[in-house]
A protein has these predicted regions:
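A structured binding-face within diverse protein domains that lines the active/interaction site
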Residues: 121-123, 140-143
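N-terminal active-site beta-alpha-beta segment that forms phosphate/nucleotide-binding
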Residues: 2-132
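Short amphipathic alpha-helical segments and helix-helix/interface helices
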Residues: 78-82, 158-163
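Short glycine-rich, flexible loops that bind phosphorylated cofactors or substrates
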Residues: 74, 145-146
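Surface-exposed, charge/polar-rich loops and edge strands
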Residues: 2-21, 25, 32-36, 132-137, ...
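Redox-cofactor binding/interface segments in oxidoreductases and associated redox assembly factors
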Residues: 67, 139-140
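Alpha-helical protein-protein interaction elements
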Residues: 60, 149-150
Length: 185
């Protein structure tokens, strides 16, 4: 994954080394950090991050783009999804189909979305499995580090998904407080 949107090493969490800690400990810690910010502050930070994503040269040339429908505590992707869709890009979003599986579906507008049992807006429609056609993938996570390690929410959806899109350019996004020197792998 690429982390050119990551914070400078002076961010508060940068020097923290979680290699000796467990993944659940780090997830709890990140959740506590997120609670220190208001919804407005996270929205403001999201806009700054998404502006950088929009300017990314790999995104500009991509035709088929994997994004995620953000939850309230994640970098907000809703405007990005709409903008790229309006630009004529083919947008793919994840749909959780079981406790261990997610699949991709084509975004066809917000009216063709429904709220999942996890409270996430997901596209309706047919399963998409042409992974080789994906040019660009925006990857969320609970924490990342300088060695390109990612910590998710603990279900393994992206651990299983990322190897399927080996050709795609992958860009991880997170708030600065989610980026660490080292995280458990």
């Amino acid at each position: 994954m690429t982390y050119n949107l990551s914070p400078k090493p002076s961010s508060p969490t940068w020097e923290e080394d979680f290699r000796g800690k467990t993944k659940p400990e780090l997830r709890r810690y990140v959740r506590l950090l997120k609670q220190q910010f208001t919804a407005e502050e996270l929205t403001e930070q999201s806009h700054l991050i998404i502006n950088k994503v929009q300017a990314h040269p790999q995104l500009r040339v991509a035709n088929t783009i994997f994004l995620y429908t953000s939850m309230p505590d994640e970098v907000n992707t809703h405007e990005l999804i709409q903008q790229l869709y309006d630009d004529g890009k083919r947008i793919l979003l994840p749909v959780v189909v079981s406790p261990t599986e997610m699949e991709l579906r084509l975004f066809r507008g917000w009216k063709a979305m429904e709220c999942s049992s996890y409270g996430i807006m997901e596209p309706t429609g047919n399963y998409f499995d042409d992974y080789e056609s994906i040019d660009f993938a925006l990857i969320p996570g609970m924490a990342f580090d300088a060695e390109c390690n990612r910590l998710g929410r603990g279900r393994g959806y992206y651990d299983r998904f990322l190897p399927l899109i080996s050709r795609a350019y992958k860009l991880a996004v997170c708030f600065s407080f989610q980026f660490f020197a080292h995280i458990p792998t």
